[in-house]
Amino acid sequence: MNKSKRLFPKSKRSFRRRLPPIQSGDRIDYRNMSLISRFISEQGKILSRRVNRVTLKQQRLITIAIKQARILSLLPFINNQKQFERSESTPRTTSLRTRKK
C-alpha cells in the first residue's frame, strides 16, 4: 500500500515515558506508609495492577504489605471519611414532641 493512499496517516508525535511508581531504592514494606498509600483508593481499596502500572511481583508485594498494615492497624480496612463528612454537615434538630389530647 502506497503512503499517499493511506486513510489515516501515522502521527509522528512523540510521547513521554512515565516514571515507574516504585523506584529501585524503594522497599515495599508495611512500615513504608508513604509508598503504600499511593496504591490505595480513597475508599481504602487496593488499586489494580493496571492502574498502578507495576509488575506482577511488585503488585503481590504491595498487596501483602497493605494487608499486614491493616492487620497491625496502621491502615484502615475501610475509609468512611466521606460518610462522616456528610453526617456532620447536616444539622440535627432536636424538637420536643408534644402530645395532643
From Swiss-Prot:
Alphabetized UniProt keyword annotations: Chloroplast, Plastid, Ribonucleoprotein, Ribosomal protein, RNA-binding, rRNA-binding
Protein's cellular compartments: Plastid, Chloroplast
Domain of life: Eukaryota
One GO-annotated biological process of the protein: translation
InterPro entries: Ribosomal_bS18, Ribosomal_bS18_CS, Ribosomal_bS18_sf
Any one GO molecular function term: small ribosomal subunit rRNA binding
First-listed, main subcellular location of the protein, grouped into a coarse class: plastid
CC terms in the record's Gene Ontology section: chloroplast; mitochondrial small ribosomal subunit
HAMAP family: Ribosomal_bS18
NCBIfam families: S18
PANTHER family cross-referenced by the UniProt entry: 30S RIBOSOMAL PROTEIN S18, SMALL RIBOSOMAL SUBUNIT PROTEIN BS18M
Family: Belongs to the bacterial ribosomal protein bS18 family.
Complex formation: Part of the 30S ribosomal subunit.
Name of the protein this chain belongs to: Small ribosomal subunit protein bS18c
Species per Swiss-Prot/TrEMBL record: Aethionema cordifolium (Lebanon stonecress)
The gene coding this protein: rps18
